[in-house]
Amino acid sequence: MKKIGILFGQENTFPQAFVDRVNSKKENGISAELAHINKIIQGEPIGYDVLIDRISQDVPFYRAMLKNAAISGTAVINNPFWWSADDKFFNNALATKIGVAVPKTVILPSNQHPTDTNERSFRNLAYPLDWEGIFNYIGFPAYFKPFAGGGWKNVYRLNNMDEFFKAYNETGQLVMMLQEEIIFKEYFRCYCLDRQDVHIMQYDPRQPHEFRYVRNPKPLEKKLLDDVHNGVLALNKALGYDFNTVEFAI
């Protein structure tokens, strides 16, 4: 029997719905369940043929466990080795190389020194940074957000330099990005599976969570949808992700 497990966090709907859907298909020799993780021994399998990862971005223990599982025979979705090398700034930089339009973005050193470092650790870094050049490149309003992670945590919308430095002083050891604001007319959230199947949904991130997926969406031009579809595929093929969401503000 081939066993599929889904590893998840605080979400309550998708994991069980996924398990129920897989099991309802009654594929011979395949079953799915909510993953149960116990004793993890180096180089030893954990009892799953496939693990779908929905939480390791927030749990370092799971990241280590998934890499151990991957080298021990489990197919992990998404690739835990690639994920560990991934971050939002890299994704933006990659997008510029494959022709996908992204907002102007710069990455900044953390406001406070990382633990076990001091000013001598940063003698290669210019001080002060070229703030005028950075602000002229990005412009205001701008968004200020961590270079890794998600969930709209520690995200600021800034209108000027004074607001920037106030926010920067609140970020501690977080490595942050400053990003051009895009005033969008259309916004899409897109699922991509197996780097070939794309499901495009109209989305409004300004609404409360339960109202963000647009009900009864208006018809849109085929070219616009084709451009979004092609951008989703280009990003996921370049990133090597089997299961991912991509958002476009247009």
Segments from the language model and where they lie:
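Conserved N-proximal alpha/beta basic substrate-recognition cap immediately N-terminal to
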Residues: 9-121
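Beta-strand scaffold of nucleotide-dependent catalytic cores
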Residues: 167, 177-179, 187-204, 245-246
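Active-site nucleotide/adenylate-binding loops and adjacent lid/helix of ATP-dependent enzymes
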Residues: 2-8, 70-73, 81-188, 217-230
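Generic enzyme active-site microenvironment
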Residues: 51, 143, 245
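Conserved hydrophobic "DFG−1" position in protein kinase catalytic cores
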Residues: 157, 192, 248-250
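Short, solvent-exposed loop/turn segments at secondary-structure junctions
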Residues: 11-13, 57-58, 83, 148-150, ...
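A long amphipathic alpha-helix within ATP-dependent nucleotide-binding catalytic cores
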Residues: 209-250
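Coil-to-beta-strand transition motifs
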Residues: 100, 195, 240-243
